[in-house]
A protein has these predicted regions:
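Coiled-coil dimerization/phosphotransfer module
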Residues: 1-149
Length: 149
């Protein structure tokens, strides 16, 4: 249980391998194809940023399976000199993005999306969701970074 709150592996094995392990668990428990790739020169990422990105990956993938009935999810992380770009793309059912609630409804629907947006906003970063019925979903996160050379 403690591991799920804050994975110790960030410090031990790094962010990328931690993501791979999380996606392995998802693959094994849901019979889904999950791919993870990185581009750019990898650098250390602040632990708050790492944890937030991991939570966004977990929530977006969970939504892809539960609501989108996706069979394949592609996660990519692009290390750029001044930002990190995370993209999560699925082949699920897709949906009308105008139907995303701005705030959580009484039945807690939309809670995961609201939490993802709030977590990214606090870093500060930007989160966008693009989707159309029948065309899957793309969640994109851009976070500015101040890496030390």
């Amino acid at each position: 249980m403690i591991y799920n709150l804050r994975p110790m592996s960030f410090d031990d094995i790094g962010f990328n391998i931690t993501v791979e392990r999380a996606l392995d668990k998802l693959r094994n428990s849901n019979n889904i194809r999950c791919n993870f790739k990185t581009s750019g020169d990898e650098y250390m990422v602040d632990s708050l940023v790492s944890l937030t990105l991991l939570r966004v990956i977990q929530e977006a993938c969970s939504n892809s399976i539960k609501h989108g009935h996706a069979k394949e999810i592609n996660v990519s992380l692009k290390y750029e000199p001044k930002s990190l770009t995370l993209t999560i793309k699925d082949d699920g059912d897709g949906f009308d993005t105008s139907a995303i609630p701005e705030f959580t409804r009484e039945d807690n629907s939309g809670f995961g999306l609201s939490m993802m947006k709030e977590r990214i906003y606090l870093l500060p970063g930007k989160l966008s969701i693009s989707s159309k019925p029948g065309e899957g979903c793309i969640v994109k996160v851009i976070i500015p970074v101040n890496k030390e050379d």
